[in-house]
């Protein structure tokens, strides 16, 4: 295996795709799991568990958190993933409103449950706008 093939395996065929044997697209994984593919369910559970571990680790390192922000493909578009990541996070002050989570509205949507100590937000990603802003900044230097 040459270096390009190795990078392809590490970057494209490992992680959730490697565990599931299906895909790295969470929509495909959720559909496969609904159809009985236990490996797809395991891959999703492992991913969500990893996100929880990172939240807990960073909360410990920072002495707590003020907000959790979900963005990008999975964070922005997958209510099930957000719910699973936030499940059992009450100890940290994270609780989400089920209805708001399942139907986020606007580019910035607060899905925090009433009484939660940590705000939980879903923020739309606009990568093209960020690239344009960064390009403008570089060109103006």
Where are these regions (language model features)?
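Adenine-nucleotide phosphate-binding core of ATP-dependent small-molecule kinases
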Residues: 8, 15-19, 26-61
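Alpha-helix initiation and N-capping motif
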Residues: 3-4, 22-26, 82, 132
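A conserved active-site cap/scaffold subdomain adjacent to cofactor or substrate pockets
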Residues: 1-12
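Internal helix-turn-beta structural module
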Residues: 41-61, 65, 69, 75-141
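Short, surface-exposed linear patches
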Residues: 22, 32-33, 90-93
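Glycine-rich beta-alpha junction loops
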Residues: 14, 74
């Amino acid at each position: 295996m040459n270096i390009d093939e190795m990078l392809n395996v590490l970057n494209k065929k490992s992680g959730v795709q490697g565990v599931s044997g299906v895909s790295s697209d969470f929509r495909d994984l959720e559909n496969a799991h609904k159809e009985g593919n236990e490996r797809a369910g395991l891959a999703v559970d492992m991913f969500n568990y990893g996100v929880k571990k990172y939240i807990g680790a960073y909360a410990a390192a920072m002495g707590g958190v003020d907000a959790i922000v979900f963005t990008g493909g999975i964070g922005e578009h997958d209510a099930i993933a957000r719910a699973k990541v936030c499940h059992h996070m009450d100890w940290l002050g994270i609780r989400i409103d089920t209805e708001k989570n399942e139907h986020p509205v606007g580019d910035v949507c607060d899905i925090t449950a009433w009484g939660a100590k940590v705000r939980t937000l879903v923020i739309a990603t606009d990568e093209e706008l960020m690239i344009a802003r960064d390009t403008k900044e570089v060109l103006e230097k």
